[in-house]
Amino acid sequence: QIILLGRSSFHVLMIRTWNERIEYLVKANNYLDCIALGTDFYTDQGKAVVGLKGSKEKKKSVIGNKMLSVLLKYLNVCMSKNFPQEGNMTVLKEYFATIVPPCVNLCLTLKRKDVLFDQVWNAFQVDPFAKATFLECLESFILSDQLRNVPVSITQEFVKHYEITERYMALEACVTHLNVPSLDIHQVMNVCWTHGLYDAIIYIYNNGMLDFVTPAEELFAILIQAMDSSGFNESQHINNGYESVTKRLTSSQIKLGNKLLVYISCCLAGRAYPYGDIANDQVKRVKTDVYACLTALHSKKAAEDELVYPYLRTLLTFDTQGLLNV
């Protein structure tokens, strides 16, 4: 403390304890600064922290419990007292864009996913703008692998929201970073097949069913149909090379063919698709199964006039050099 002597009195100045500093901001209805300050205390980045005793773990526990109580108060305040009384769509979007991310970030900093997916979710899902902002906040944490396990009821809303807003690329990326038990597989597969999110389809087959052959067969069927529909044949490819592919197929069909090449290459190299590694005890089986699929004499649902080695023929016709590199 500091004592200042004046002409007619003296003044005592004291540094507030960490708890008093938190309470001061709460009483001033300045919850965002309060959450930021509490986060600094918790991550050991706060300045002039007074009043905390014990081990580092004990301090974190005390601060964490305090900030959770602050968070629950804030959830009530921001959806009632602080809620814009007269606001259009833009005002509401800006309001929730300001208040939702700090709440999500605090829960993850405190490692309290239970609170995030219970009290915080329940508070924000009642308003469509708050709900949308909450779901979009999850994206960065999913992609950074901080959130791999999410309740299925919430991922269902996440998938629905991203499909409605046509954020297909972001949705596909997020699906491949979530553990499969977090997903409603029927819902996700329907969305992925509808919009051609092949990475996510492969990921679910590989990680949810340990099936590395079916996705290849399904994607081969689509590519073969596309090449047949375009009037593409092997002699044209021999005469014109890869350029003949780009002229006759759409960009999405070419992308599919390239994905197939990369997927097969990953499987034969013991690498997971689209990232990571295949479990050691699965590598040999995956290599054998995928190689057998690639060199199959006929496809799974072969027509009577199907030529032999349809999958090899398809990739050789699509991109000879690419297949040889594989």
PLM features per residue range, with description:
Residues 1-326:
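Extended non-globular scaffold/tether segments
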